[in-house]
Amino acid sequence: MNGKAPELSVVIPCFNEAANLAPLMARLVPVLEGLGRSFEILLVDDGSRDRTLEVAAGLAAADPRIGILALSRNFGKEIAITAGIDHARGNAAILMDADLQHPPEKIIELAAAWDEGFQIIHATQAVRPSEGMVKRLCVKSFYKLLAQLSDIKLPRGAGDFCLLDRAALDALKSMPERARFMKGLYFWVGFRQKQIPYEPAERTAGASAWNMRRLFGLALNGLTAFSTVPLRLASIAGILVSFIAIIYALILVTDVLLHGIDVPGYASLMVGLLFLSGVQLISLGILGEYVGRIFNETKQRPLYFVGNYRPAEGHADAGSLSCASQASPEAASATRT
């Protein structure tokens, strides 16, 4: 590269992936070399607790085309991806996981689609036989719900394995929000997009950090990031409950005045109170999610802090402490120097 921007940057967020990095590089580097393009590989350590950073440092020492971006703590995968995008110097960036579930060989097709003029190319995964029925049902329901409640139409199997050209990268870097749902942002920015299917492999080592609780949190973040329909649903629910209560009250008054029927007390009262209380609590919870997002946005904290940045070919000071805030693209740019 000789100081010039590489054609491709491969951004790999890592969290406790020490056992997977060497096998990944053994497959990834030959694929990139076979493309005949200049490239850099950026390993983004998201506060790993194992030897991930140590292994990454050894790989970078052996191959100057490998760079390291170590965050000061664990900020989560969405922020780690954002940090990698901020520091990617290539004309296009390929995002992929470190666990080898994203086959490096698929990069050949992603690069070919980029040559055809597409600016965002998604590798969409097929359903894995090892996935449980409950997880498949939850994922399918989320994609359908997001499509119904927002203008973001995520295809089934779309993830973080994708190629983004420089225009898309700059668009993503300009976005200020803190609670980020990157899969939705890839589609929201627009540009010419294409999908390429692939068969995901099993993890070669270690266990996934994603459980149902974290997946639910990501889904909730995605819904609140791209839709205000839940707020409208809470209002509609309140109107319906009020309407039902008025109808029920009219029925009771009619029974008493016209038919002399005694109004049953505690059963109907308790059912009404419990139902109304449930609707109120759900509405407050939905409102709280949006208020919490507003609170986090108004704090204007940096998205992340960088504890150690050593770019490919060593063009920056290692060990420097820096930060980046999506509210200020200039601050994000400062971390790349």
What feature does the model see in each segment?
Residues 46, 73, 98-100, 151, ...:
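Short, conserved catalytic or interaction motifs in soluble domains
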Residues 30, 34, 58, 62, ...:
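Conserved amphipathic alpha-helical interaction elements at protein-protein interfaces in regulatory
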Residues 67-73, 77-87, 92, 104-185, ...:
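Acceptor/aglycone-binding surface of glycosyltransferases and processive sugar-polymer synthases
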Residues 1-4, 181-337:
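Hydrophobic helical membrane-anchoring modules
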Residues 13, 71-73, 162, 235, ...:
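Short conserved micro-motifs on helix faces and helix-strand junctions that flank
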Residues 1-132:
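Structured catalytic core of nucleotide-sugar glycosyltransferases
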